[in-house]
Regions:
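Short, structured motif recognition centered on aromatic/hydrophobic residues
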Residues: 33-38, 48-50, 81-84
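An amphipathic, aromatic/His-enriched active-site/gating alpha helix that lines ligand/cofactor pockets
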Residues: 26-29, 57-70, 76, 86-132, ...
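Extracytoplasmic/secreted proteins, especially bacterial periplasmic and envelope-associated proteins
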Residues: 48-55, 95
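Bacterial N-terminal signal peptides that target proteins for export
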Residues: 1-12, 18
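Sec/Tat signal peptide C-region and signal peptidase I cleavage site
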Residues: 20-24
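Short beta-strand-to-loop capping motifs
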Residues: 38-43, 85-89
Length: 142
């Protein structure tokens, strides 16, 4: 009889303990973020633009930031280059500015003026990805 009472007490304690535990659902990690940039070069400035972008890759590497992945236009729309790069933190931006200064390069608005010598226009679009269509549907709860 003592054994049954002990088992019943243990079962009751287990039920009470299990009912009081809050189970946290692991939320999915946030999706990766990126900036997609599309550049229209000034006619005759394609090589100069590529040199400027290569400088930015060296700055990023010196700051420990992943470089932009560049795609060159071959047929179709009017853009020349499309880049996909990481969304940086303020600390990464500061590290890149410091690296650029050490290399003797412009920072801040002056860096933007240097870029604009070689482009007719550009766009920057903040995105999430890369992800599959299935992953995007999961984010929608579908």
């Amino acid at each position: 009889m003592k054994q049954i009472i002990k088992l019943a007490a243990a079962a009751a304690f287990g039920a009470i303990a299990a009912g009081s535990i809050v189970y946290a659902q692991a939320s999915p990690p946030p999706p990766p973020r990126a900036i997609v940039s599309v550049y229209h070069a000034v006619p005759g400035h394609q090589e100069a633009l590529l040199n400027w972008l290569a400088q930015q890759d060296r700055v990023a590497a010196a700051a420990g930031v992943a470089p932009m992945q560049l795609y060159a236009h071959t047929d179709g729309d009017s853009w020349d280059y499309m880049g996909i790069g990481p969304v940086t933190t303020e600390a990464q931006d500061d590290a890149m500015d410091a690296a650029a200064r050490r290399m003797g390069l412009q920072t801040g608005p002056r860096a933007g003026l240097e870029l604009r010598k070689h482009i007719q226009s550009h766009t920057d679009t903040f995105t999430v990805g890369p992800m599959t269509a299935t992953q995007l549907l999961q984010r929608l709860g579908s």
